[in-house]
């Protein structure tokens, strides 16, 4: 029976298979045709892939490579420009130190003394403005320091320009003013019912008060600045004895520089700005940008140049450029220091850097033609203001730092045909970094961290610069930099230590750039033949640390 069972089962399976094929609409001819179609589709796909490869190769060689090469050349040119600008300024500082070209030797300076007959009336009338806006943590320190300045009380007017909208802050300011008035200080508070023009608008309106007309000079101190008692004694004589001097600017020092690593980085950058940029400008050209605070102005020079204007968010720089174009001289005093506080929160620092980069770029856009057609100053000074002061320091350095070191250099791993010379990626940035750290010797060991952090911040500065040049949507955005009042930190400890959630700490832009640089680093590690991936891994880490909120307090 088994002899008949096996053939039967074979026939049964074969018949069932054929029925299933027929039931699904298949046939032996269809199966063969399907095989041919699959082969044809495969060949077509291979052909399309070859065509895509050819198209990509052609696009890469004809479009992408030339464009990328052009961007590299542009960045190399900017590297040379920025390097020589930094070298020039440091050379000027070396000259100042070797030949001891202090302001006291260049300009006339004599100590102010009371006249035997008229008493303190031979002292000029000085107005001190303290602009503030809801800065409850720091205003007491500033008012106390300013009311303690050594100057005849009959020749001094302290003006608190309070734009605060918080009733508690207003009340606190009133209490502080009443306290000092009871001690014989001529201190007043000026308020308005709007915030038109922000800081510039407030100070401009305050200068229209009748009692200001008797004043010769005006000193400006932001709400977190604490001058030493001898500030006016040391600064005002330059204005009294040199009628062509319009501004005397002091150097900032920082009470919370050791708060965290971010404040140490800020100290390095700002020390370079004051000790190198400001002093070289003062020495070589008698011109620099007013820092908005810790300076004394000649009121007549301000008025001749049009006074405060609120057309940009850098009203201080705007005023300085206009006064400088009228032929006035500026004096920077490196040994006269004023204490103040650095922003210790990353968000506050980002807002500050946006304003400090957007405002100058926008002012550059607005004033270029005005500078070119100015007839009061020399061609050399106009060239210095346009090229060195604005283009190199306010535009080129930001574009170079971000686009070259965070975009072009990482992307170069995909274009091995293009060689980026080592002088532009190693020697030039190393020398520029050394120039910067010389202004803060105690932080020399932090130079690597400073470079990586500056590259991260260059993203925000470049964005702000583009908005300023193009007059984008945030061009006139004004956000008061938040300060924690470190001198009062014991009172604020419970508020400062509050932790943000993980989601609130994430900064998406930094994370996205970090992901891109990390991808370039991995590609360079696997396929590259250069050392770049070492730098790229470090830079990606810096973006991730900032992106996930592990910067600042």
Curated annotation (Swiss-Prot):
It is an enzyme of class 2 (transferase). Gene3D superfamilies: Spore Coat Polysaccharide Biosynthesis Protein SpsA, Chain A. The active site is at 163, 316. Its main location: Golgi. GO terms for biological process: cell wall organization. One of its GO terms (cellular component) is Golgi membrane. The chain crosses the membrane at residues 64-84, 395-415, 431-451, 510-530, 531-551. Belongs to the glycosyltransferase 2 family. Plant cellulose synthase-like A subfamily. PANTHER family: GLUCOMANNAN 4-BETA-MANNOSYLTRANSFERASE 1-RELATED (PTHR32044:SF73), GLUCOMANNAN 4-BETA-MANNOSYLTRANSFERASE 9 (PTHR32044). Probable mannan synthase which consists of a 4-beta-mannosyltransferase activity on mannan using GDP-mannose. The beta-1,4-mannan product is the backbone for galactomannan synthesis by galactomannan galactosyltransferase. Galactomannan is a noncellulosic polysaccharides of plant cell wall. This is Probable glucomannan 4-beta-mannosyltransferase 1. It comes from Arabidopsis thaliana (Mouse-ear cress).
């Amino acid at each position: 029976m088994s002899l008949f069972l096996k053939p039967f089962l074979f026939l049964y399976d074969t018949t069932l298979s054929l029925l299933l094929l027929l039931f699904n609409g298949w046939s032996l001819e269809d199966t063969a045709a399907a095989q041919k179609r699959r082969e044809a589709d495969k060949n077509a796909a291979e052909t399309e892939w070859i065509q895509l490869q050819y198209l990509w190769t052609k696009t890469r060689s004809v479009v992408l490579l030339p464009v990328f090469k052009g961007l590299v050349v542009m960045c190399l040119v900017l590297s040379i420009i920025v390097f020589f600008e930094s070298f020039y300024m440091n050379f000027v500082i070396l000259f100042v130190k070797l030949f001891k070209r202090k302001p006291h030797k260049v300009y006339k300076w004599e100590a102010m003394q009371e006249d035997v007959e008229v008493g303190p009336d031979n002292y000029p009338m000085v107005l001190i403005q303290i602009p503030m806006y809801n800065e409850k943590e720091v205003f007491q320190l500033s008012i106390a320091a300013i009311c303690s300045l050594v100057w005849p009380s009959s020749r001094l007017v302290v003006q608190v320009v309070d734009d605060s909208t918080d009733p508690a802050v207003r009340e606190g300011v009133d209490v502080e003013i009443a306290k000092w008035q009871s001690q014989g200080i001529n201190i007043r508070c000026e308020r308005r019912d709007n915030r038109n023009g922000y800081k510039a608008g407030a100070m401009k309106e305050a200068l229209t008060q009748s009692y200001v007309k008797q004043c010769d000079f005006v000193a400006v101190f932001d709400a977190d600045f604490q001058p030493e008692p001898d500030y006016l004694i040391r600064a005002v004589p330059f204005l009294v004895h040199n009628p062509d001097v319009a501004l005397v600017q002091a150097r900032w020092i920082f009470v919370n520089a050791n708060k965290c690593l971010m404040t140490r980085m800020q100290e390095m950058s700002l020390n370079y700005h004051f000790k190198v940029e400001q002093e070289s400008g003062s020495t070589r050209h008698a011109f620099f940008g007013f820092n908005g605070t810790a300076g004394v102005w000649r009121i007549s020079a301000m008025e001749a140049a049009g006074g405060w204007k609120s057309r940009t968010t850098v009203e201080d720089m705007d005023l300085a450029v206009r006064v400088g174009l009228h032929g006035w001289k500026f004096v920077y005093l490196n040994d006269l220091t004023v204490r103040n506080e650095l922003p210790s929160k990353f968000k506050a620092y980002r807002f500050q850097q946006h304003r400090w980069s957007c405002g100058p770029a926008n002012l550059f856009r607005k004033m270029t033609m005005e500078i070119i057609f100015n007839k009061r100053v020399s061609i050399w000074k106009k060239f210095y203001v346009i090229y060195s002061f604005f283009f190199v320091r306010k535009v080129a350095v930001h574009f170079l730092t971000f686009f070259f070191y965070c975009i072009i250099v990482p992307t170069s791993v995909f274009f091995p045909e293009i060689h980026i010379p080592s002088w532009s990626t190693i020697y030039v940035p190393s020398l520029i970094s050394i120039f910067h750290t010389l202004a803060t010797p105690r932080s020399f060991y932090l130079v690597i961290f400073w470079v990586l952090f500056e590259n991260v911040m260059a993203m925000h500065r470049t964005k702000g610069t583009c908005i300023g040049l193009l007059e984008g949507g945030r061009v006139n955005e004004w956000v008061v930099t938040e300060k924690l009042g470190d001198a009062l930190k014991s009172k604020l400890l419970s508020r400062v230590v509050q932790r943000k959630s993980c989601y609130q700490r994430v900064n998406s832009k930094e994370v996205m750039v970090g992901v891109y640089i990390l991808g370039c680093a991995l590609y360079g590690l696997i396929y590259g033949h250069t050392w770049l991936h070492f730098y790229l891994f470090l830079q990606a880490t810096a973006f991730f640390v900032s992106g996930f909120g592990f910067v600042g307090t």
